[in-house]
Amino acid sequence: MQNRNFNNLIIKWAIRLISIMIIINTIFWSSISEAFPIYAQQGYENPREATGRIVCANCHLAKKPVDIEVPQSVLPNTVFEAVVKIPYDMQIKQVLANGKKGSLNVGAVLILPEGFELAPSDRIPPEMKEKIGNLFFQPYSNDKKNILVIGPVPGKKYSEMVFPILSPDPATNKEAHFLKYPIYVGGNRGRGQIYPDGSKSNNTVYNASITGKVSKIFRKEKGGYEITIDDISDGHKVVDISAAGPELIISEGELVKVDQPLTNNPNVGGFGQGDAEVVLQDPLRIQGLLLFFGSVILAQIFLVLKKKQFEKVQLAEMNF
């Protein structure tokens, strides 16, 4: 009897523990799923549209700069750095999902040419590993290893990120050629304004849904407001709801027009995209170029020597 009670007690505690883990996991992953660039991975087969626009701009509406630095040319089957810079003012704070203020995170998507991919860990030089730090890059999908994503990561530490890239070898990869290739990058700082389902986050401005008079403003316990507007045409009431975070810029008794901002725009981040070019250089071409330069230098040396020899002969004839 005691053993049965003990077993029942263990089962109850196990069920409670599993329930707690499920709740924590749900909260954790829901917060992560609201973060970039996982939205793009879940909603788009390719992050770059046919127009050249990177889909992250669908959720991050403000435009901000981003920069990328790559070598002018690389040799086949070599590891090189792609440095992505996402600048912003480190002193500013953003509105978090709970309405409080916090530091900005950053994220990036790097679209490489076919054949280029993330360098294996054993191929990355120690000095490059130091620059990379604790960043964890991952392919956009199993069939798109040439597209890399990272984030969200702390912006104060990683506003400049080093991607270790492995170049293809045309000798073993028939799809690769010795050509000039484009590289595209998208980078954002801060949270987005729109979720993929079209709903607003609390990091954006909230507008009036009708034209009318603000008859009541109710502040919700967990933050945010319920704003009651009396329609100017027939007097029916509409309640517009703003999430915790944005601050009201209207007051009771005020007349508002449809789409007029009811709150400020708390967004301090934004998204930007850029591009660069890298040449996959043929080693034989470099060798040929070196041989050409060497032959030119030798020809110049022989020309100088021949000229001096000719001058000596002329001088000898004059003395004779």
From Swiss-Prot:
GO terms for biological process: photosynthesis. Its main location: plastid. The keyword Cell cycle does not apply. Binds 1 heme group covalently. The chain crosses the membrane at residues 286-305. Its cofactor is heme. The keyword Repeat does not apply. Keywords: Chloroplast, Electron transport, Heme, Iron, Membrane, Metal-binding, Photosynthesis, Plastid, Signal, Thylakoid, Transmembrane, Transmembrane helix, Transport. InterPro entries: Cyt-f_TM (IPR024058), Cyt_f (IPR002325), Cyt_f_lg_dom (IPR024094), Cyt_f_lg_dom_sf (IPR036826), Rudment_hybrid_motif (IPR011054). Component of the cytochrome b6-f complex, which mediates electron transfer between photosystem II (PSII) and photosystem I (PSI), cyclic electron flow around PSI, and state transitions. The 4 large subunits of the cytochrome b6-f complex are cytochrome b6, subunit IV (17 kDa polypeptide, petD), cytochrome f and the Rieske protein, while the 4 small subunits are PetG, PetL, PetM and PetN. The complex functions as a dimer. This is Cytochrome f. It comes from Marchantia polymorpha (Common liverwort). The lineage of its organism: Eukaryota, Viridiplantae, Streptophyta, Embryophyta, Marchantiophyta.
